[in-house]
Amino acid sequence: MAKKKDSNALAQNRKASFDYAIEDTIEAGMVLTGTEIKSVRQSKINIADAYVRFDGGEATLHNCHISPFEQGNRFNHDPLRVRKLLLHKKQINQLIGASGRDGYTIIPLKVYIKNGFAKCLLGVGKGKKKYDKREDLKKKDAKRDVDRAMRDRQKY
């Protein structure tokens, strides 16, 4: 059975759950220009390679690609510009502490619209080793086999 798509997610970072063990999530607002928010509403955003950095006590989103707005004019935005994330000071300090630990990083998990504002769900993740990824795949296959057996058993 296919997974249900998250109805309000405009962009998801599916590779994040495979490459990182996500331990904590925080919602952050995004500072966008007019043409950027129009492109985001059309789901023309890619956060697969994006990451969060902290510059001068501010959280910024790097390597997030938002396609130029098709009906935009010559004042259209730069697709890969650095975007500021809106967080409380306490949350920023919490994320700085988490990213300072060895092997941890802050990555965007999904982008969505909430009450008319663009939001980004950030995850604190620890990078997985190759054997961790293989182990997760084995667990996933075993769970699928058990679910299939239970489903077949209920038919009769």
From Swiss-Prot:
InterPro entries: SmpB (IPR023620), SsrA-bd_prot (IPR000037), SsrA-bd_prot_CS (IPR020081)
GO biological process: trans-translation
Subcellular location: Cytoplasm
Cross-referenced Pfam families: SmpB (PF01668)
GO terms assigned for molecular function: RNA binding
Residue stretches of biased makeup (Basic and acidic residues): 132-156
Family annotation (CDD domains): SmpB
Top-level taxon of origin: Bacteria
CC per GO annotation: cytosol
Function: Required for rescue of stalled ribosomes mediated by trans-translation. Binds to transfer-messenger RNA (tmRNA), required for stable association of tmRNA with ribosomes. tmRNA and SmpB together mimic tRNA shape, replacing the anticodon stem-loop with SmpB. tmRNA is encoded by the ssrA gene; the 2 termini fold to resemble tRNA(Ala) and it encodes a 'tag peptide', a short internal open reading frame. During trans-translation Ala-aminoacylated tmRNA acts like a tRNA, entering the A-site of stalled ribosomes, displacing the stalled mRNA.
Stored NCBIfam families: PRK05422.1, smpB
Protein known as: SsrA-binding protein
Biological source species: Exiguobacterium sp. (strain ATCC BAA-1283 / AT1b)
